[in-house]
Amino acid sequence: MTLTERLSLYEKLARLDKPIGILLLLWPTLWAQWLASNGDPDWLILWIFVMGVVLMRSAGCVVNDYADRDFDPHVARTRDRPIAAGKVSPKEALLLAAGLSLLAFLLILPLNALVLKLSLIALFLAGSYPFTKRFFAIPQAYLGVAFGFGIPMSYAALWGEVPAEAWLLLAANVFWAIAYDTEYAMVDRADDLKIGIKTSAITFGRFDLTAIAFCYAATLALLAWVGALRDFSGWYYAGLAAAGAIAVYHLRLIRERDPRQCFRAFLHNTWFGAAVFGGIVLHFLLRSGSLFP
């Protein structure tokens, strides 16, 4: 196998060819970066966090495929993944995940001690999440904590502490992750039932649509709470309203539980995150007058 072919396999293993996961992890980090900096981000810290998101999401995907190597060959959507197809060995995958994690850790060395301590928790969450599908009825909640841990780390980097506001944002992200990853899990529900892994789509059963609607509502309510605590302007709530409209659109897409439409709704969640971020950015731009000098 040539070096180019090997690198192509690593790219697929790290899902760099499928950026939706990066975006779903990046949006809550960007929310926190703008909120913690009051709309004036430290561009070096922002760059460190963006690169960290890419590296840790990639490492998490590699660990996920390692953990699921005995399950993936039995699922139509995943049987061609590099480890499942026998093109990358489990040992090779672990070395790749370790290398990506090390690069992410090196990135944050210029930051404060609290960020370094929190990064160890983030590493544990990213590495352990794939195994929760064996034990937890709703592993998507664990995913929400893992995907949202850039939130407390962002506040720690900019404030030197993690305030209550950060935990509200993290809770909002947990509910959002349950919503979008349940949509994703609905795609594979039949296969997951056969192989015996646990997902929120299986746990919620016939109440899946109601649960997703509740999680979207809880996400928006918690984000509105953050806005109320900070006395944010109507622009912030306009972003939340846009996100709410997007959530309603997702519920319409998945109402028949068609796997293709469920996957479409999952992919579309990047616009939910973008709408929230847009509201945050507009609030700070218009408050400071920097949009219309």
Swiss-Prot record:
Pathway: Cofactor biosynthesis; ubiquinone biosynthesis. It catalyses: all-trans-octaprenyl diphosphate + 4-hydroxybenzoate = 4-hydroxy-3-(all-trans-octaprenyl)benzoate + diphosphate. It is a multi-pass membrane protein. Its cofactor is Mg(2+). One of its GO terms (molecular function) is 4-hydroxybenzoate polyprenyltransferase activity. It is an enzyme of class 2 (transferase). PROSITE patterns: UBIA (PS00943). Keywords: Cell inner membrane, Cell membrane, Magnesium, Membrane, Transferase, Transmembrane, Transmembrane helix, Ubiquinone biosynthesis. GO terms for biological process: ubiquinone biosynthetic process. It comes from the Bacteria. It is found in: Cell inner membrane. One of its GO terms (cellular component) is plasma membrane. Pfam families: UbiA. Its EC number is 2.5.1.39. Belongs to the UbiA prenyltransferase family. PANTHER family: 4-HYDROXYBENZOATE POLYPRENYLTRANSFERASE, MITOCHONDRIAL, PRENYLTRANSFERASES. NCBIfam families: ubiA_proteo. This is 4-hydroxybenzoate octaprenyltransferase. The gene is ubiA.
